[in-house]
Amino acid sequence: MATSERFLPWSRATVFKHSPALARLLEHSFQPGSPETALNCPTLTATHAALLECAPCKICQLVYSLASDPACEVAFFEDYACLCFYALYAPLCWTSTFMAAADFLELVSRYFPGAVGEGGLYGPEGIMAVDLQLHFLIKRCFRPVAASELLDVCNLHFLKSEFLKGALTGSVSNLFCFKSIWGSMHAPAVKQQAGGGGCGCCGLSSSLSAAAPADKRRAGGGGGAAETRRPEFAEAVSRAFPQGGGRAQTGVKPELLSVFLDVWGESDLLSEANREMAAAAPARAAGALGRFEFTYPETADRCQGPCMLSQALQLKKSNRTASICVLCECIAGHAEGAEALRLLKRDILTFVENNVKIPDRISFIVRQRDSLVYVRDPLLRGVIRGCSEQEIHKHLFCDPLCALNSASACPDILFGEPGEEELRILKSSLAIGNHLAENIFLDCEVLHTLVIIFKSIQLCKVGKTTFLEIIKELNHQLKNHNLQTLHTFHTATIYC
């Protein structure tokens, strides 16, 4: 039975309310500590099984069974749709998966407490991190799809699953030929773009902003030096989440970045400076928001941390960068994160007129005592300054996933505090399928698929021809969507 308290995703209070269950999910999100235990590791077995394209989606199965209950309240549909809406505007990163886990557990325990069971909702015998990722962030099962487009979408999802399996196991099948499969796909968006045309799916009228021109929406993704005003939401959304100046009007939710630091403090992910900041968390939390307590399992690979909640499924490091981007976590975990990084990128580009290398520009700016003065929260400022020059370079100028996250995420939605009436109207609209078909800032299933494939081939072995074909196609798509990054071959060879 529902409580009188309203459901609002991305809330810090939800994390602490369900901390024991989330700790269980984290415990089963580690790589095994030794090769001898890998074959019988329940986490790896369950994750690999979920990535099979013939495997059912555990979230879809559970939601369908709950929704089929005659006693199911209308409010459940509204709140579930609200969570899906937040996931649509969240970056693809560790924090987003973690928050989806917290919010989904809150929904199930609120409306169907008997469905949780004594063993909990999360674990090898139930729902795993990969199930949450696939449903809410990678395949987005909640999105409306026309019958004529379903097979095309399934083909793209197959490619995502195949390369994610490669990231998990370390290699993609020798029988797999990307060029042959990609070239034979009959998806209209693939064929149109392969022929030199624009992005068909991003040119469609959005359910959120039917009047927004395609070129304006693509420019809203940014990535270049020039700033373009983002498209506007439909009325029901804009009333709940006024963009820009609306933050002061509606308020802002507490940050989640400190929870990320709490969980990752013992791993090898954080830089020395950020590790010290994580170690100082108890002093900060004494009179503030509280600390998320979590103990790493003894038999797990503690160096990699709970990496299975990340799309990378492992923690790999190269040239002072990692397969899990701390700056993407800043976007998902702090209301100021996206704007702070946008302003930092502007400062880097305009720092000097000479042909100074970007990593040098970054180091000069970060060294200045008054750098990032526009960031009000010292925690966020400290985390950004604690990142290496290479991490900042990778996030702002190189990595296609970071560029995609920066273009499509919406802090106004994730961290806004909508009024009661505005939220009620929005949820009613979401429950009948409105506003879930497309992210109005940047939404292309072809590009999304290629980015996931690219991040996977950074972590697993593929043939030389396959590698180069993926690089070529991804560069073409990034250019089509006005996402200006360094050539992805450059990124793939030096960074994670």
Curated annotation (Swiss-Prot):
Segments for region (Zinc finger 2): 325-402
One protein family per Pfam: Herpes_env
Amino acids binding Zn(2+) 3: 201-202, 444, 481
Intrachain disulfide bonds: none
Subcellular location: Host cytoplasm; Host nucleus
Region (Zinc finger 3): 201-481
Binding of Zn(2+) 1, residues: 57, 60, 135, 141
Region of interest (Zinc finger 1), ranges: 57-141
Keywords per UniProt: Host cytoplasm, Host nucleus, Metal-binding, Zinc, Zinc-finger
Chain positions recorded as Zn(2+) 2 binding sites: 325, 328, 395, 402
One Gene Ontology term, aspect cellular component: viral envelope
GO terms, molecular function: zinc ion binding
Function statement: Plays a role in efficient localization of neo-synthesized capsids to nuclear replication compartments, thereby controlling cleavage and packaging of virus genomic DNA.
Family assignment from sequence similarity: Belongs to the herpesviridae UL32 protein family.
Protein name per the record: Packaging protein UL32 homolog
Organism of this sequence: Equine herpesvirus 2 (strain 86/87)
Organism classification: Viruses, Duplodnaviria, Heunggongvirae, Peploviricota, Herviviricetes
